[in-house]
C-alpha cells in the first residue's frame, strides 16, 4: 500500500450566513478559489496529473447541485481531463472526501487528488427540502432529526450543566479571537473578496463569524433554543451558521518526494462509526476508538486534537469518554472551534483537518486527531502523523 500524505491545506475565511461577507459569492466560487489556490501554491504540480477531485457538500441542490465539484473545477480552469465528484456524509462530507482519495492513492488508482468541501448556508439553508420518510418513525425518534434535541439528550445523559456549556462556548470564541490576533490562522486562510456590511467590496483574510466580546455572563442570559422548558442548549453554545470552503492537496508519498514538495502530514488511519441517532453527537467516540486501534495508538499518544464543536453539550461528553476532559486546555481545539468559526456542513471535515495540521506544526507534535459527529448518528475520525 502507498503511504498517503498531505502536501498543502487551505480554507476560505468563514463568513456569516445571515447578510455576511459572502452573500454575493456563490458556493462554486468559494470552491474554485481554493482549487486554483492549491495549484498556484504548488507550481511543481502539473494540473493534468490530478486524478480526481473529491468535494464534500451536504445540500446538493440549487448552486450546490448537479455535482458542485465538477462545476467548481471547470470554473477554476482545471484541465477537463481531471475528474471530480461530490461526496455526502452530512457533517463529515469533506473528511469522507479525504478518506476516499486516501484509499484511491493507497491502492494505486491515483497519485494526486484534490479534496475539500463547501457549504453556503446563507444561500442554501441546512433544512432546505428535507423530507424524512414517515416510516423512519418506527425505528428512529422524530427528535433524532433535530440536532439540537440530540445535543440536549447527550448532555443530560452525561451530566453536562448549562454553566459547563457556556464556559466551553466562551472559550471557543476567546481562543479563536486570540488565534486571529496572533496570526495563527494566517497560514491556512486563503484571502478572498467579499462585501462588508455597507456593501463595499473588500479582501477578507479573517473569519467574520468570531464574536470576541462573548463572555460566560452574556451567554448565561440566552434562552434555550431547542427545548424552551427544560433545555440547556442555546444558540450561543451551538455551532454558528457560516459559509465557507476548505481544501487539501493529497498525494502518494513517493510522488510528493519526486516533485520536491514539502510533506506536511501523513494519513495514519481513518475510521467511521455509527451510533444511536438520538445521541448523534456521540459518534466521534466510537470512530476515534476505531481509528486509534488501526493506528496502533492510544489517546495518550495524540498530541493535538480537533473535535468539531457542533454543540458544547455534544463536545464535552465526547471529550469525557475519550479521556480528554482534563486535557482540553492542553490539546483540544486550542484555536477555538465551530462554535466560534461556524460549521459549514460540507466544509468542516477538511477545515478541522487543516487547522489540526497547522496546530501540529506550531506545537511540534507527532500525532494529531481530527474527529466529528454526523447527523442521524455517525462519527468520522482521521489520525495524522507529521513526517
From Swiss-Prot:
Keywords linked to the UniProt accession: Acyltransferase, Cytoplasm, Fatty acid metabolism, Lipid degradation, Lipid metabolism, Transferase
GO biological process: fatty acid beta-oxidation; phenylacetate catabolic process
Gene Ontology MF terms: acetyl-CoA C-acyltransferase activity
Active site: 91 (acyl-thioester intermediate), 343 (proton acceptor), 373 (proton acceptor)
Protein's cellular compartments: Cytoplasm
Oligomeric and partner information: Heterotetramer of two alpha chains (FadB) and two beta chains (FadA).
Protein's name according to its UniProt entry: 3-ketoacyl-CoA thiolase
Lineage: Bacteria, Pseudomonadati, Pseudomonadota, Gammaproteobacteria, Vibrionales
